[in-house]
């Protein structure tokens, strides 16, 4: 099975909200890493099935984050 990995850097305060969004989207869980030298930021990585391409998944996530008024620093994806 092929997976797409998407990493998003956000403020630590919104991690719980992001977890709820990921559960609604189709996430198989997520990994949270605190950004070195910046304890207020966290990198959240999720793994999604590749039945959609990277750009489709990024658009879905970006829309969900905007709808929830969650801003992010960056979003990176890879297969």
Per-region residue spans from a language model:
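N-terminal auxiliary segments of SAM/dcSAM-dependent transferases
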Residues: 2-79
